[in-house]
Amino acid sequence: MPDTNFTHPMRKWEDILTIVSGKNQKNVETDNGQYPIYGSGGIIGRANAFLCEAGTTIVGRKGTINSPIYVNERFWNVDTAFGIVPGPELLPKFLYYFCRHFNFKDLDKSTTIPSLAKRDLLAIKMVVPSLPEQERIVARIEELFSELDKAVETLNTTKQQLAVYRQAVLTFHLTPKDNWRICKASEIGEVCLGRQRSPQNVAKDYPTKYIRAANITEDGLDLSD
């Protein structure tokens, strides 16, 4: 039965999970290491030791701070990445999807490179449903994501098929026929060179249209920019 109690208390991260700070990989890095080394953006090497258990979510400490990564094996995280380890009240995937939903940029207080502080992460509050309800939520999220992935795959396949069809139409209709006359462009029209935009044309009440190469697409002129 789904959990019908919608009054779950908000819990601070410091009470329901552990944050593993990353460390320099210099002394553990090796080409044939058993464990992956993760930075905030993904795998950057291999190591012969690990810091985090499988089922940990990576959240960037510096740099890429808003793209959580779920890792289903033991790994070493460097000092630009936090390992968010769920406690007994949290399912690993439920915590991961919460991290996907949460906007970590709201905690960024840096003025240059995006950065997060461990103390700010531990102060994050989240609702913690019962474990069966977390399991149901995770299953539903993954079911919907799977459907979306299939839809994207179908869309990409359709776009590729349309591109092939478009090219076939052009080839069929523009391949020279026996009764066609081959001539130079200068014989049937005028080729004009473009010019840079004139400030006086840009500033007037009704600016002259300016077409760049970027405006010319397979579907015609795109004048949105």
Question: Which ranges hold each PLM region?
Answer:
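A short beta-sheet element
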Residues: G39-H101, K109-L121, G194, R212-A213
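Short arginine-rich
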Residues: S146-V152
